[in-house]
Amino acid sequence: MLPSIVKHATSHKINPLKKHGQNFIFDSSLCDKIIRASNVLENSNVIEIGPGIGGLTRSILQKNPKSLTVIEIDERCIPLLNEIQEYYPNLNIIKQDVLKINLTDLIYDKVTVISNLPYHIGTELVIRLLKEVKLITNMTLMLQKEVVERICAIPSTKAYGRLSVICQILAKVEKCFNVAPTAFYPHPKVYSAIVKIIPLENPPSIALINKVEQITKLVFAGRRKMIKSSLRNLIPNIHEVLTQLKINCNDRAENLTPKDYLRIAMKL
């Protein structure tokens, strides 16, 4: 029988490392709640990024997935994960930095992604997963609360920005619930939140997404400027383009919808 999460981590003398952005979850009931939000189904394929001491890993495995592949950069955690693997042969362990893996080579079938992501790689990894990996059916991620609010923000709100636009033209997004700092060891200085991201079946092309990224980088750098001013150098006939698209030339970056940005990108 596996020891508790706390005893297991203690027996391996694993303390969180700041360089890996580690904040461990010892509460198995919270792990179970996250897995319920993800709606992991029996016989599904799951990838967990950064399993650490294996709290979420255990909760996923209890749902009896067809396979669970965990990607862990911290070699100290590998022996602990190997011990979990002795009880669950459907667990596959990859010791690697997820930012250096070619994820398209790793994923060969439809997969669910679940992760308590380190804050310092969260935004970069979300965008990369959405842009590069076509076989992800859904992602349930723990991120900094502020980042989740930006992902899910609607136009004309303070949180709305580039991240909102890119995520929402590639996926359906939904904030599930907040997680207090006290749920982690060590306690982070900010709240976290769970977000569910369901990639669209027919997303825009990478070329079009790259254009949206180019446009949003310009307009949100001066979000109080009017769109016609922000895009004048990139699109010399911007007034004509916006008029054709029936977008108000005097609108600011935060007023346009993700769909508006896609429509502008199509004119580039």
Swiss-Prot record:
Gene Ontology CC terms, in alphabetical order: cytoplasm
One protein family per Pfam: RrnaAD
Main location: cytoplasm
Claim: rRNA processing is one of the keywords in the record: yes
Similarity section: Belongs to the class I-like SAM-binding methyltransferase superfamily. rRNA adenine N(6)-methyltransferase family. RsmA subfamily.
Keyword presence, rRNA processing: yes
InterPro entries hit by this protein: KsgA/Erm, rRNA_Ade_diMease-like_C, rRNA_Ade_Mease_Trfase_CS, rRNA_Ade_methylase_Trfase_N, rRNA_adenine_dimethylase, SAM-dependent_MTases_sf
Name assigned to this protein: Ribosomal RNA small subunit methyltransferase A
Disulfide bonds: none
Source taxon at top rank: Bacteria
EC identifiers of the protein: 2.1.1.182
Binding site for S-adenosyl-L-methionine: N23, I25, G50, E72, D97, N116
Organism: Rickettsia prowazekii (strain Madrid E)
Catalytic activity of the protein: adenosine(1518)/adenosine(1519) in 16S rRNA + 4 S-adenosyl-L-methionine = N(6)-dimethyladenosine(1518)/N(6)-dimethyladenosine(1519) in 16S rRNA + 4 S-adenosyl-L-homocysteine + 4 H(+)
Signal peptide, first to last residue: none
Classification via CDD domains: AdoMet_MTases
Function comment: Specifically dimethylates two adjacent adenosines (A1518 and A1519) in the loop of a conserved hairpin near the 3'-end of 16S rRNA in the 30S particle. May play a critical role in biogenesis of 30S subunits.
Localization, UniProt: Cytoplasm
Keywords (A to Z) from UniProt: Cytoplasm, Methyltransferase, RNA-binding, rRNA processing, S-adenosyl-L-methionine, Transferase
GO molecular function annotations of the record: 16S rRNA (adenine(1518)-N(6)/adenine(1519)-N(6))-dimethyltransferase activity; RNA binding
Enzyme class: transferase
